[in-house]
Every structure is written in C-alpha cells, then in structure tokens.
Amino acid sequence: KNVYPDLKKDFIEKGLVKIEFRHFPLDIAAFNASKIGQCNNDGKSKIMHILYSGQKKWAKGKTPEEAKANLKKFLVDEGVNLDFEKCIANKAIEDYVLNDRIEGVKKFKVNATPTIIINGKKFEKALNYKNLKKYLEKLI
C-alpha cells in the first residue's frame, strides 16, 4: 500500500517492471476475499484495488460467518456487482487460490504478506520504497 504508488509511477507505467499478483490468504476473511478477487477478475476490473483499499472494513469477524457477512456487505456498499455466493462456493476458484498459497510456501518460503518475489527470488530487505527502488535499479 505504501510502496505501490511510487513503484507504479517509476517502474510499472514505464514498462520496466511487471506485477504478477499471487493469492496468499492467511485467514478465512482473506481466503474469501481472494476467491471474490479471482472470480470477478477479468484483468481490467478494479476488484483487487477495491478489496485492498477497503481491507479494514471487511477483514474482520469473530467467526467465519461474520467474516463472510462483512465481506458481502462491503462489496454491496462498494457497488461491486457479482454473485457472491456462487463465487465463494466455486471449487475451481477455491483450488486456484489454495494452489497459489501452497506454491508460495513451497517455492518461495512465503510466510507473511506482503512478500515480494523478483525474478524468482524472495526480496529479503525491509519492504520500503527506497530499498525496493535501489534493488530494482541494479537489475535494470
């Protein structure tokens, strides 16, 4: 959230860097949000931006049912048009999200979010724009 705006301006918009998002849900609220993001993501949709920018509104709940209800209400309030229950229940999407998470652990030893992988290697420095920019400039 704090790194992305500068990264986008200085690297992505100039075609120097490409972002590839992978799901790594750490709890049921994030798992459901990942399924919604994958279900409604046509590559042009702003669903991931909506989910990330409103994370504090939906990423809560003492029970799985409460977490699901919070996410559903958030999406309605944001005007996101989708079949919520169908997306949440979609087994293929569920498998896709879980496989992203499994690959993150096995291939890159991911244990937290956010984690940055650059050219197949985990970025191990403190995640701030100064460190990331310096690292990327060495690669370009």
Predicted regions and their residues:
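C-terminal cap of thioredoxin/glutaredoxin-like
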Residues: 1-4, 8, 73-140
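Structural alpha/beta surface segment adjacent to cysteine/selenocysteine redox centers
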Residues: 1-76
